[in-house]
From Swiss-Prot:
Residues binding substrate, per UniProt: S10, K42, L74, R88
Stated name of the protein: Phosphopantetheine adenylyltransferase
Function: Reversibly transfers an adenylyl group from ATP to 4'-phosphopantetheine, yielding dephospho-CoA (dPCoA) and pyrophosphate.
Entry's family note: Belongs to the bacterial CoaD family.
Keyword terms of this UniProt record: ATP-binding, Coenzyme A biosynthesis, Cytoplasm, Magnesium, Nucleotide-binding, Nucleotidyltransferase, Transferase
HAMAP family (UniProt xref): PPAT_bact
Keyword Nucleotidyltransferase among UniProt keywords: yes
Residues that bind ATP: S10, F11, H18, G89, L90, R91, E99, Y124, S125, F126, L127, S128, S129, S130
InterPro entries tied to this protein: Cyt_trans-like (IPR004821), PPAT (IPR001980), Rossmann-like_a/b/a_fold (IPR014729)
Compartmental location: Cytoplasm
Record PANTHER family: PHOSPHOPANTETHEINE ADENYLYLTRANSFERASE
GO CC list: cytoplasm
Co-factor(s): Mg(2+)
Amino acid sequence: MTSIAISSGSFDPITLGHLDIIKRGAKVFDEVYVVVLNNSAKKPFFSVEERLELIREATKEIPNVKVDSHSGLLVEYAKMRNANAILRGLRAVSDFEYEMQITSMNRKLDENIETFFIMTNNQYSFLSSSIVKEVARYGGNVSGLVPSCVERALKDKFQTPLK
């Protein structure tokens, strides 16, 4: 049986922290779908299409990763892909309460889909897409925080020189 996992998020933009979780998940599962979810509570900086392209570029060296988007419930997407797992990254204890609520709801919707938590490497424990955008907005150096394709895309969006 093929093991299929879903790694979802807004990825606005994808960071090296996200990429770390994806790479580590890809070592455990036969296939990993990286899915951009449309979060109605967030106003996106990059369009869904831009995010998909950035993720494809960032994950092109990982052969068992596929990139997609979805606007419905994650559990429904997982069922559609015959996935048996959801991958979630945890940066700090503060992430756990929110993630536990989401996991409990997903389990209520489908008890056959397990959630696997992966602790972020310490070097990325502070990192979020919001922080990256804020630093880039003011022309700060985001290399070492995001893949190079994202660094270029941020520079283009903000019209700032790379530092």
